[in-house]
């Protein structure tokens, strides 16, 4: 009976691996680009700006399309070009001047080889969930410390709070110290779990999307916090309240740490 169960489990794992293999085989045709030292920065910037662009378009249209305002957390606010351009400029500058040298050092110290086989689907999902939970925990601790210690707040985190009403391009409007800290959290978690390169790519896409959505200022019916049950995920309304009140909702994504420490505040309780 045990052998029969083990055989079924082996077939299930093999099938889930085959499910991802065509995608991985296709990505491997771009192996030279993926293994290039330029790829991490190129991938990060293009993914980030690609996710920001729809919200920028919505912000431009919002004054002319009143129906869009029903989805805005702050219906009367739309970022001006003088708010958007500094955010875009800072993101590009920091990625070129600071992030690229760091990724170059990591590329030289830890060369990556693309394995021939894709990860099992269950393993990929498990690692992505663990990466998100670890990042959420690390940033929660970092975030609370930077709000409780005035010097840390002034030196590293104050810049991110210059825009009290969030918008997508303000997601990475932060000091270089904060940006690099978030990058280190990502890198450590991926190395700790020994994630497959495909898992790493998908995790980064999900993480960038969730962070942009958190700052977008739009609460849609399909927003992440409406899709995750039981109030486990805070989402855009949760994080927007942090930007307006400062002393609550420190976790970027999930709600458990704020619940445990008594810093969770509902957007409905404003």
Swiss-Prot record:
Keywords for this protein: Endoplasmic reticulum, Glycoprotein, Iron, Lipid biosynthesis, Lipid metabolism, Membrane, Metal-binding, Monooxygenase, Oxidoreductase, Steroid biosynthesis, Steroid metabolism, Sterol biosynthesis, Sterol metabolism, Transmembrane, Transmembrane helix
Enzymatic class: oxidoreductase
One MF term in the entry's GO annotations: steroid hydroxylase activity
Catalyzed reactions: cholesterol + AH2 + O2 = 25-hydroxycholesterol + A + H2O; cholesterol + NADPH + O2 + H(+) = 25-hydroxycholesterol + NADP(+) + H2O
Segments crossing the lipid bilayer: 38-58, 81-103, 127-147, 167-187, 190-210
Glycosylation positions in this chain: 5, 163
Position of sequence motif Histidine box-2: 157-161
Cofactor(s) required, per the database record: Fe cation
Membrane topology: Multi-pass membrane protein
GO cellular component: endoplasmic reticulum membrane
Keyword Endoplasmic reticulum: yes
Residue ranges annotated as motif Histidine box-1: 142-146
EC numbers for this chain: 1.14.99.38
Chain span(s) of sequence motif Histidine box-3: 238-244
Gene Ontology process terms (BP): B cell chemotaxis; cholesterol metabolic process; negative regulation of fusion of virus membrane with host plasma membrane; response to type I interferon; sterol biosynthetic process
Subcellular localization, as worded in the UniProt entry: Endoplasmic reticulum membrane
Post-translational modification: N-glycosylated.
Domain Fatty acid hydroxylase: 128-263
The family this protein is said to belong to: Belongs to the sterol desaturase family.
Role this protein plays: Catalyzes the formation of 25-hydroxycholesterol from cholesterol, leading to repress cholesterol biosynthetic enzymes. Plays a key role in cell positioning and movement in lymphoid tissues: 25-hydroxycholesterol is an intermediate in biosynthesis of 7-alpha,25-dihydroxycholesterol (7-alpha,25-OHC), an oxysterol that acts as a ligand for the G protein-coupled receptor GPR183/EBI2, a chemotactic receptor for a number of lymphoid cells.
PANTHER family cross-referenced by the UniProt entry: STEROL DESATURASE
The protein, known as: Cholesterol 25-hydroxylase
Gene that encodes the chain: CH25H
């Amino acid at each position: 009976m045990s052998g029969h169960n083990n055989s079924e489990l082996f077939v299930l794992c093999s099938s889930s691996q085959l499910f991802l293999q065509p995608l991985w085989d296709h990505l491997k045709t771009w192996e030279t680009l993926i293994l290039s030292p330029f790829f991490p920065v190129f991938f990060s910037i293009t993914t980030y700006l690609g996710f920001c662009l729809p919200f920028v378009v919505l912000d431009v249209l919002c004054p002319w399309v009143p129906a869009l305002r029903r989805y805005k957390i702050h219906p009367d606010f739309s970022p001006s070009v003088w708010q958007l351009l500094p955010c875009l400029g800072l993101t590009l500058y920091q990625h070129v001047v600071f992030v690229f040298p760091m990724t170059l050092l990591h590329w030289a110290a830890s060369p990556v080889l693309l394995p021939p086989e894709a990860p099992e689907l269950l393993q990929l999902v498990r690692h992505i969930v663990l990466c998100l939970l670890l990042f959420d925990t690390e940033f929660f601790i970092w975030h609370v410390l930077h709000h409780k210690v005035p010097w840390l707040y002034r030196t590293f985190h104050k810049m991110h709070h210059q825009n009290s009403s969030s918008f997508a391009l303000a997601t990475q409007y932060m000091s270089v110290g904060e940006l690099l800290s978030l990058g280190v959290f990502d890198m450590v978690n991926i190395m700790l779990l020994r994630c497959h390169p495909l898992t790493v790519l998908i995790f980064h896409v999900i993480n960038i999307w969730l962070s942009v959505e958190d700052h977008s200022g739009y609460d849609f019916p399909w927003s992440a916090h409406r899709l995750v049950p039981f109030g486990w995920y805070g989402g855009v309304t949760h994080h927007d309240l942090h930007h307006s009140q400062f002393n609550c909702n420190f976790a970027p994504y999930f709600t458990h740490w704020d619940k445990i420490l008594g810093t969770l505040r509902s957007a409905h309780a404003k």
